[in-house]
Amino acid sequence: MTIFQGKSGKKPTGGNLKQAKKKRRFELGREPTLTKLGTKVERKVIRTMGGNSKAILFTADTANVYDIHEKKIKKVKIITVKENPANSHYVQRNIINKGTIISTEIGEAIVTSRPGQDGVINAKLLN
């Protein structure tokens, strides 16, 4: 089953609208990725509009963390998800998205990338 992102076809009163056109492929969406913390990296590259590509990250165990003081990027192992402003239930399920605070080997970091869209977890070290 796909997600349709076009007009609903209903009037505000509940009656049916006259259909102006058929459903088009560009009006389709997809389910949210919900990148999870796992033991290995699972990623898939999909075709998007205009022939472009998008990398979807399903599971990850490492993150590219930027250290502000040293001004260096380190690839470190993610231990757990600490806090998620998008949804508090994502913490229990270890789901990582943009803005999530993760616990890593070198300290806590905030995720700056969109793992479901970019295919990688980039983060910035918190003090």
Swiss-Prot record:
GO terms for molecular function: structural constituent of ribosome. PROSITE patterns: RIBOSOMAL_S8E. Pfam families: Ribosomal_S8e (PF01201). GO terms for biological process: translation. Coiled coil: none annotated. NCBIfam families: eS8. Part of the 30S ribosomal subunit. This is Small ribosomal subunit protein eS8.
